[in-house]
Swiss-Prot record:
Its main location: membrane. GO terms for cellular component: Golgi apparatus; membrane. GO terms for biological process: xylan biosynthetic process. A motif (GDS motif) lies at residues 185-187. Keywords: Membrane, Signal-anchor, Transmembrane, Transmembrane helix. Disulfide bonds: none annotated. May act as a bridging protein that binds pectin and other cell wall polysaccharides. Probably involved in maintaining esterification of pectins. May be involved in the specific O-acetylation of cell wall polymers. The keyword Transmembrane helix applies. It is found in: Membrane. It comes from Arabidopsis thaliana (Mouse-ear cress). Contains 2 motifs that are conserved in esterases, but it is unlikely that this protein belongs to the catalytically active pectin esterases. This is Protein trichome birefringence-like 35.
Length: 449
């Protein structure tokens, strides 16, 4: 027995030595191969891209479902520290990037965004009655809150070279049969959603319609059509600490510029999507908390840069998840404000308060609509080509200085005597009365569906 064991033992060092040599050769060969691959990839990337000082970050977007890959931002989230901006940028590639932007026959025939407002006192306008919509928001119900001049409800948008498709609620429901229509964005997009619900609900029996409680996602349901008209509160499109639909007035605005995970998990299965974002970027700066950051450290950038990152993350989701033959995506351009009457009435000192008629000056453009931001948005949308249709509300809404609630709405905070003596000081010249301008935005959506 001992002799057999000795013979086996004497053969083991030789076999072991051969095994070690083979493994060592394989490791060295693979390391060299990996180095060559990395070198080739780096050279290839450098050839594809101009030299840049930026680090490009792939957006964190879901392909199936939101799995909670990182701590979700909420209104209690804080920056433990704020450091200098690292220069990271959102890098995304549309797998079908070579497609040109397609123009429909309708768009070739007529630009429905170029036109004028025509007063229409017929029974056709307004398209719905404020008092007959049980889902009306007190923020938009101007007549209920004391506005006596109702001419703002009777202005009809008339394109220069053609007619806008006439609104028909039954036809719209047929387009939506078996589908989910979802508005995603801020309070202006919520106003458009409320307008759409008010336009549609009148033809549905009361016992065949329902509205879910106000939440991150709020849903109006029409049973007979097996259809929903929904609103998702996502004012910055990417994840942020302002994503609570009620408690979102915070002194410090924090976003994850590389993540639409939380919101996209709600919107990804909708059939028709209407996005907007702009108002919440109208401040000096925003803080960035990247998905890879685990210690609560933030970077600070100008809001315009933050918006561009958010648009790029959103664009990456659209590029990789939208088949325009199966899902329709619309982007609504910026909604203008009318904070300074001197812009349309030189020498005056006021805002939209007391205004009763639209601006008549052709191509009027106020300071409430930022042209560099429009150009940035256009750049993103052009890359997406036919995957996104644009509803350009900006110019046509610029004329409507008379369409805002001003003082005729519910204010959530009590007003002191000094402010009450000066109505212009607390006038809302950002949102829009309903019925009113948002109905035309929805008429444009109906036109393109």
């Amino acid at each position: 027995m001992s002799q057999r064991w000795s013979r086996k033992k004497s053969r083991l060092p030789l076999a072991g030595l051969l095994f070690i040599l083979v493994v060592t050769f394989m490791i060295l060969f693979n390391e060299r191969s990996i180095q060559q691959i990395h070198h080739h990839a780096a050279s290839h990337t450098q050839n594809l891209r101009e030299p840049s000082t930026f680090d490009f970050v792939k957006p964190n977007v879901p392909r199936i479902n939101y799995l909670g890959a990182h701590e979700v931002l909420d209104r209690f989230s804080k920056c433990n520290s704020t450091k200098e901006y690292s220069g990271k940028k959102i890098g995304w590639v549309d797998p079908f990037e070579d497609h040109p932007g397609q123009v429909t026959k309708e768009e070739q025939k007529c630009d429905v965004f170029s036109g004028k407002w025509v007063f229409d006192n017929s029974s056709s306008y307004p398209l719905h009655k404020e008092s007959q919509c049980p889902y009306m928001s007190d923020q938009l119900a101007c007549q209920k809150h004391g506005r006596k001049d109702l001419e703002y409800q009777h202005w009809r948008w008339q394109p220069h070279a053609c007619n806008l498709k006439r609104w028909n609620a039954i036809e719209m429901w047929e387009k939506l049969r078996g589908k989910r229509l979802m508005f995603v964005g801020d309070s202006l997009n919520r106003g458009q959603w409320i307008s759409m619900v008010c336009l549609l609900q009148s033809v549905i029996p009361r016992d065949k319609q329902s509205m879910s409680p106000n939440a991150h996602l709020t849903i109006f349901r029409a049973e007979d059509y097996n259809a929903t008209v929904e609103f998702l509160w996502a004012p910055l499109l990417v994840e942020s600490n302002s994503d609570d639909p009620v408690n979102h007035r915070l002194s410090e605005r924090i976003i994850r510029p590389d993540s639409v995970l939380k919101h996209a998990s709600k919107w990804q299965h909708a059939d028709i999507l209407i996005f907007n974002t702009y108002l919440w970027w109208r401040q000096d700066s925003v803080k960035l908390r990247w998905s890879s950051e685990e210690k609560g450290s933030c970077e600070e950038v100008k809001s315009a840069e933050g918006m561009e990152m958010a648009m790029d993350s959103w664009g990456d989701w659209v590029a990789n998840n939208v088949d325009p033959n199966k899902k329709r995506v619309f982007f609504v351009t910026m909604s203008p404000t009318h904070q300074w009457s001197r812009e349309w009435n030189p020498g005056s000192e006021g805002n939209c308060y007391g205004e009763k008629k639209p601006i008549e000056e052709e191509s009027y453009w106020g300071s409430g609509s930022d042209i560099p931001t429009m150009r940035m948005v256009k750049r993103v949308l052009e890359r997406l080509g036919p995957k996104v249709s644009v509803i350009n509300i900006t110019q046509l809404s610029e004329y409507r200085k008379d369409g805002h609630p001003s003082v005729y709405r519910k204010f959530w905070e009590p007003l002191n005597e000094d402010r009450l003596k000066n109505p212009a000081s607390y006038s809302d010249c950002t949102h829009w009365c309903v019925p009113g301008v948002p109905d035309v935005w929805n008429q444009l959506l109906f036109h393109f569906l």
